[in-house]
């Protein structure tokens, strides 16, 4: 990592390695996860895989005479930033030794089970504390370090580095020989030992996933309803990892940190794609309004990451981040905004048996009117903020498209006569005669304000009721009328919004 960058966030999670004979039929390997500015690194960590690791395995010696933990090489080589969130009682849950007067750095000599430091799964006996909330402790005395740690609030950011050469000194520290500043836990939280699972095919070397427009999603599994799983995929779809955290809070914290780092790349990605989009010269290649990953709920019950790119007129979908003009010009699916509507908080029967559950409160449906009917797709996002942003952008995009297009025409038949129906956002509905060789004649004109109801038969017929003498007129559009129905609704919605803004 280049000098000058902040220390990465690190912690121990579990990596799914493949099928096995244990619970859930899956094999898991304990790994060290390191979140840097531009990449997520998964490194091998020693220890048997299991659904709930013991604190002693994660944080160092917990019994008198126990040996210090065997830590992954990647952890020995780097400075790390660890955020500790203290409970109302119990403090950080560490003891320290060393100090300038002892010609030693400030070292963690003991970690109490169940307290805040232990729960991070990212601090170890033998870690040197380099700073506390940005305050340098590299030359602090023991008392200065104690005071710096005591005056912290509920959230403490420690910068640490593991000191392999001094960790044997604390081999028997759990027996009570350490001099600590934190009160020992009154009633330490106990965790039940986990039965080791079958030996997986271990990760043999570090795996790096670029964070540039990467996809990250919190998940459940059919055998574990707690959303403590993370799926992370590189933007090109080539590198992917499926991780298990100790609980939902840990998974949420990691997902938030990873998403925040990914978010720093979005302005650059938008600029790159904007240049490619402009170079394609295709219709609708205006400014990019929004870009991001959605999780599509497939009809089979599974899910798939889908990259959505919103322009002024279209919503484009890709399986991976386009890297060329050719890739950008070939989306897997395109939805014209003027014929698309969105809805969320749907009432549904839930995912099918064996599928990955998802949060219906963070889901929304996209419905697009086409010549073959209504094309419906269900997506989910990771946070209420994402849902609000996509919903707002889609509604605004629909209105922008309506205001930009202004008018749409289609061939039809009315009372047996070939006609052309024009729908204009300001002028309303106009029927023109379209007999071969005949002069263009206006047969009917009605403003939007006169429209009392519209409906269709889902096959070819469009019904427009203007009241008055004409009543309901029936138009045969010779194909599924859903596209025109959605466009009429978009014009109406844009007009209502316009009136609301002017009121």
Swiss-Prot record:
Membrane topology: Peripheral membrane protein
Main location: membrane
Family matches, as CDD domains: PDZ_syntrophin-like, PHsplit_syntrophin
Region of interest called Calmodulin-binding, as start-end residue ranges on this chain: 481-503
Ranges for region Disordered: 40-68, 177-203
Tissue occurrence: High expression in skeletal muscle. Expressed at intermediate level in heart, kidney and brain, and at low level in intestine, liver, lung and testis.
Organism superkingdom: Eukaryota
GO biological process: neuromuscular junction development; regulation of vasoconstriction by circulating norepinephrine
Protein keywords: Actin-binding, Calcium, Calmodulin-binding, Cell junction, Cell membrane, Cytoplasm, Cytoskeleton, Membrane, Phosphoprotein, Repeat
Positions bearing Phosphoserine: 95, 178, 183, 187, 194
This protein's GO CC annotations: anchoring junction; cytoplasm; cytoskeleton; postsynaptic membrane; protein-containing complex; sarcolemma
PTM characteristics: Phosphorylated by CaM-kinase II. Phosphorylation may inhibit the interaction with DMD.
Pfam family, one: PDZ
Record-annotated PDZ domain positions: 81-164
Subcellular location: Cell membrane, Sarcolemma; Cell junction; Cytoplasm, Cytoskeleton
UniProt domain PH: residue ranges: 6-263, 287-399
Cytoplasm keyword on record: yes
Known role: Adapter protein that binds to and probably organizes the subcellular localization of a variety of membrane proteins. May link various receptors to the actin cytoskeleton and the extracellular matrix via the dystrophin glycoprotein complex. Plays an important role in synapse formation and in the organization of UTRN and acetylcholine receptors at the neuromuscular synapse. Binds to phosphatidylinositol 4,5-bisphosphate.
Family stated for the protein in its record: Belongs to the syntrophin family.
Subunit structure: Monomer and homodimer. Interacts with MAPK12, TGFA, GA and F-actin. Interacts with the other members of the syntrophin family: SNTB1 and SNTB2; with dystrophin protein DMD and related proteins DTNA and UTRN; SGCG and SGCA of the dystrophin glycoprotein complex; NOS1; GRB2; calmodulin and the sodium channel proteins SCN4A and SCN5A. Interacts with MYOC; regulates muscle hypertrophy. Interacts with DTNB.
Domain notes per entry: The PH 1 domain mediates the oligomerization in a calcium dependent manner, and the association with the phosphatidylinositol 4,5-bisphosphate. The PDZ domain binds to the last three or four amino acids of ion channels and receptor proteins. The association with dystrophin or related proteins probably leaves the PDZ domain available to recruit proteins to the membrane.
Protein name, as recorded: Alpha-1-syntrophin
The organism of origin for this protein: Mus musculus (Mouse)
């Amino acid at each position: 990592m280049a000098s000058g960058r902040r220390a990465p966030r690190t912690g121990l999670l579990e990596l799914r390695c493949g099928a096995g004979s244990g619970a859930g039929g899956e094999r898991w390997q304990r790994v060290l996860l390191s979140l840097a500015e531009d990449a997520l690194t998964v490194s091998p960590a020693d220890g048997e895989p299991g659904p709930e690791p013991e604190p002693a395995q994660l944080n160092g010696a917990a019994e008198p005479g126990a040996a210090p933990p065997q830590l992954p090489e990647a952890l020995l080589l780097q400075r790390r930033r660890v955020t500790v969130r203290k409970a109302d009682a119990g403090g950080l849950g560490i003891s320290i030794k060393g100090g300038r007067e002892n010609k030693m750095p400030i070292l963690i000599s003991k970690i109490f089970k169940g307290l805040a430091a232990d729960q991070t799964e990212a601090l170890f006996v033998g870690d040197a504390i380099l700073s506390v909330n940005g305050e340098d402790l590299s030359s602090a005395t023991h008392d200065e370090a104690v005071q710096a740690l005591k005056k912290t609030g509920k959230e403490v950011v420690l910068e640490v580095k593991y000191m392999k050469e001094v960790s044997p000194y604390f081999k028997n520290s759990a027996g009570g020989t350490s001099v600590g500043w934190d009160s020992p836990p009154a009633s330490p939280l106990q965790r039940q030992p986990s039965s080791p699972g079958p030996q997986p095919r271990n990760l043999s070397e570090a795996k790096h996933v670029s964070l540039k427009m990467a996809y990250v999603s919190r998940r459940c599994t059919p055998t574990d309803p707690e959303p403590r799983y993370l799926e992370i995929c590189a933007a090109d779809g080539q590198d992917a990892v499926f991780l298990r955290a100790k609980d939902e809070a840990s998974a949420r914290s990691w997902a938030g940190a990873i998403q925040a780092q990914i978010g720093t790349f979005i302005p650059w990605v938008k600029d790159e794609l904007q240049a490619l989009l402009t170079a394609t010269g295709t219709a609708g290649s205006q400014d990019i309004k929004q870009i991001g990953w959605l999780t599509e709920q497939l009809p089979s019950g599974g899910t798939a990451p889908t990259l959505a790119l919103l322009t002024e007129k279209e919503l484009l979908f890709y399986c991976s981040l386009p890297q060329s003009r050719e890739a950008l010009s070939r989306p897997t699916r395109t939805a014209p905004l003027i014929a698309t509507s969105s809805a969320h908080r749907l009432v549904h029967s839930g995912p099918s048996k064996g599928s990955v559950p998802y949060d219906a409160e963070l889901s929304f449906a996209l419905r697009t009117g086409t010549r073959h009917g209504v094309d419906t797709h269900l997506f989910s996002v990771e946070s209420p903020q994402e849902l609000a942003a996509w919903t707002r952008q889609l509604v605004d995009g629909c209105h922008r498209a309506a205001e930009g297009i202004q008018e749409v025409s289609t061939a039809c038949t009315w009372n047996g006569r070939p006609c052309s129906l024009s729908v204009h956002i300001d002028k309303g509905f106009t029927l023109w005669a379209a007999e071969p060789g005949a002069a263009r004649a206006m047969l009917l004109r009605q403003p939007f304000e006169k429209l009392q109801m519209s409906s269709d038969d889902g096959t070819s017929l469009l019904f427009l009721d203007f009241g008055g003498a004409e009543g309901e007129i029936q138009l045969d559009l010779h194909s599924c009328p859903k596209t025109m129905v959605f466009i009429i609704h978009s014009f109406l919605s844009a007009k209502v919004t316009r009136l609301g803004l002017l009121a």
